[in-house]
Amino acid sequence: PTAAQLADLDVVLFDVQAVGVRCYTFLSTLVLVMEACAEQSLPLIVLDRPNPNGHLVGGPMLDTASVRSFVGFLPIPLSHGMTLGELAEMANGEGWLGGGYSTSPNPAIQCDLTVIPCTGWSRNAQWSAPIAPSPNLPTPAAVQLYPHLVLLEATTASVGRGTATPFTKVGFPGFVRGPISFTPTPNAASRYPKHAGKPCQGFSVLRRLGSWQAQGTDNRLKLEVLNELHEAWMNTPAGDQNPFIDRPQFFDQLSGGSELRLALEAEEGLEALQNKWGMQRARFMEMRSVYLRYPTSP
């Protein structure tokens, strides 16, 4: 918000449902609102809401020195497991405000922040938002799969935008091993879906989600779908001439840096990167602990 938009206000209320993923831009909007309120000496009240992916923490950290953008403002993992209220207090407490779209936050800037907590929620509880957080996350399954599939947005693969069930299936034209087929079509939720009007072959990810939950491994970010589609694309005739990651800058912004993209393009294993993310995750878990407001149920 601009200074003119805030000029006649006494207080700003922020009440938005997020899904626990760094690149979900409601978080970036919150940071910008905090900075604007700080600049205008306006108090901000965040009406906190549960995180439907509160159990999930992992993935690459954001390198704010190189890829800070509207799909990534804060130096946190791709999936952070926190509520917006907790993250607002963390941004204040860690001096992450004041950078806007630059790569140099100003620790001196503080927002006059009040967080009204939600009640009756524990971090690893199964919880679904009463309304869809956004048009392309229309179901609880789509919300749960979003962290694992969002990086595909910067690739040639479709995540089902332009269909009735986005973020539950993946594919692209010419995926010969794909057991399902779908054709993205412009609709109210996606006016310009990838591969619009072209039949895409691929597979449903719903069964994967059920398997991860049954195995108790759904608390870590999964890159297996990204890997499988990358390998499948490279084995198509189009893959000889066209990169799988067709929007490299956007991919880096989503993933938090260039390391993952470079490893995929070089067809290297991801074990070293995942080990690095594991160490970063441990440090983040310790850092965030002082800002957590909600229990973790046994």
Task: Walk through the language-model features, giving the residues of each.
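Glycine-rich oxoanion-binding loops at beta->alpha junctions
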Residues: 1-8
